[in-house]
Structures are given as C-alpha cells and as structure tokens.
Amino acid sequence: MSTSSSTARTYRITALAGDGIGPEIMRVGRAVLDAVARQMGFALQWQEGLIGGAAYDQTGDPLPAETLKMAQESDAVYLAAVGDFKYDALPPEKRPERALLGLRAGLGLFANLRPVKVFPQLVGASSLKPEVIAGIDLVVVRELTGGIYFGQPKGIFTDAQGSRRGVNTMVYSEAEVDRIARVAFELARKRRRKLCSVDKANVLEVSQLWRERVNAIAAEYPEVELSHLYIDNAAMQLVRWPKQFDVILTGNLFGDILSDEAAMLTGSIGMLPSASLGSSGPGLYEPVHGSAPDIAGQDKANPIAQVLSGALMLRYSLDQPQAADRIEQAVEAVLAQGYRTPDLYSEGMTLVGCQEMGEKLVAALSQQQAQ
C-alpha cells in the first residue's frame, strides 16, 4: 500500500466520473474532498479522464490509453461508476465494465478492501434484527488478480465425441497469498487485531496452500489473533453474528461473494465505499454500487458511498487520516440530523436529493471546524 508524504501538500487526483449516476455523485465527492482539503491545509489537483461507456462513445474504447496513463501518473484514482444497459450488446472487450479490469491490471492492484460499517442512525434500514446489526465494523480484504477468474486452462472445450465441457482453474501461488495476507495483517494490526482467513481447505488443495501461507505470515504479526473459517461457514456466520469479525481475508471468488453479502448487512449498498491497492503507485477508490442508469440525472442517487470512498483515499493513499475522520464524522452528523436520500428514506426523515445531500455534508464539515 503506497502513501504519499504528508509534506507534499498538493496531491494529483485522477477523477473518473464514468456512466449513469457517476457524474452526479462525483460532483458531490469532489466538493466534500475540496472542502476538507481547505480546512486541513492541503490541495487536490483534479484531472478528469474518460472511462466506461462515456469513453466508448467518444473513443471506441472503454479504457483509453490516455486515461490509464493519467491514472498511473497520479497520487490516487477516484472513480464513480461504469456501465449501462445500452452497452450490453457490445462484444465483451468493449463493454464499460471491462475498463475496470484494465485499470486494475494497469495500476497493479491486487488487494480490494470493502469496509462495512453500520451507522447507528441506519440500524433500521437492514433486513436483519437491530441487535444483530448494531455496531458492525468490519473489512473484507479480497485478493483481486488471482484465483479462478484468471487461472489457466479456462474455456469451453469440445471432445472427440462432440461433448462440450466448461473449464476454469483456481490457482494461487505462494507469492500471491503472501502479499495479500500481509495487507490484511497490516490492516488488522491498526484495527482491533483480529483476522479471519476464509478458504475451503477441507476440499481444495489451492486452499490448503492458502491456509499454510497465511499461517506462515501470521508469525510476523504475533499481536494479531488469527482464525480460519471454511467459506460455507463464513457465509453463515456473517449473517448469524457479523460483529464477531474485524478483518476478513479471502481469495477472489470467495471475496466476490462475501463482500456483496456483507454489503447487504447495512441495508443500503449506497453507503459502502471500497479501495483497491497495490504494492506501490496510486490506489483506486470507488463506491461498491453500480451506475444505476435507471435513476441517472434525476438527483435521486445516494452520494455517501462516493464520499466515503474519498475518505478511504485520504487515509490510504494521501496519508491524511484526520481529514478522513472529518468526512466520516460529517456523514454521521448529517444522518443524525435526519437527512436521507430516497434509498434510505423512511417516515419522519427529511428527503433530500443527491446535490442537497452534498451541500449538507459540506455544511457539516464547516460546523465541525467552527467547533
């Protein structure tokens, strides 16, 4: 995980608004980040790039070379959302979502962090009981570049008798496991010092190697309490009693599933940020939710996940943890005041649009400074 020196007071950020609600939530995210930067005495130098469907429409490529170069030369990459139903008929390599794979590969990102925190004001938004939900504060650390999505051989093959079979291969090297394990242990060391590694070591040899290497890396972090769960039990425990978890470490496929399951604990995917990190270079920060083309341009989107992704950027790439804290406190303050976008609205709350939610967040930052 890379961090810039805190003495470098101007940070170059690549902003990728993308598709659907992306431009709306990006405007809010940037406004909040600029506000906290002014308060804390540093500056953000924004550069805008094309990605996804917006890039395809203008260039014929969902990830233009100039966008990737811009991202590689920045201190961090701030992404909103890509994708739209109208691109579904395109060949796979031209679809907006393919840009994310290219961006991750081009930036050397292998660790995806999904924080899941339930704000006290939103306990009632979850479909689970309040006593199960209240106080959840966990992070899923998912390996991004290995496992069954990338292993070879892969494909659909036809044998001599004309019978077809589909093949995918789950592969992890020791080096791949070691580097993602270190990211998770470092994170756990700065949190509540509990790490749960999730695998399927009772059946899969690849998981047996995974567990062996995680145990080996654990020796470097004696202060972190390590436990292991099989993926099926982990999925069950995440719903049964999620507060038992601090940091969850797992591979690409299992992480894909568990992170979405964990996302729904909160009751709104519109609240959840994510970070994707590499060994060096800029990190990528984006909300967990998609581009929601059905509500694009209607001022209905919830910008909080975008805003909280900005807080992660401040924390992990720009070495500005106090600024990140301020943003998170502003979100909590606005929720405590009863303001809700349509996805979170309930009787007795005050309904606001995307833009007004952004204005309330900036106002909350100003109130913090005044105090």
UniProtKB/Swiss-Prot annotation:
Cofactor binding mode and count: Binds 1 Mg(2+) or Mn(2+) ion per subunit.
Protein name, per record: 3-isopropylmalate dehydrogenase
The protein's Enzyme Commission number: 1.1.1.85
Primary site of residence: cytoplasm
Cross-referenced PANTHER family: 3-ISOPROPYLMALATE DEHYDROGENASE (PTHR42979:SF1)
Record's keyword annotation contains Lipoprotein: no
Organism per entry: Synechococcus sp. (strain JA-2-3B'a(2-13)) (Cyanobacteria bacterium Yellowstone B-Prime)
BP term (GO), one: L-leucine biosynthetic process
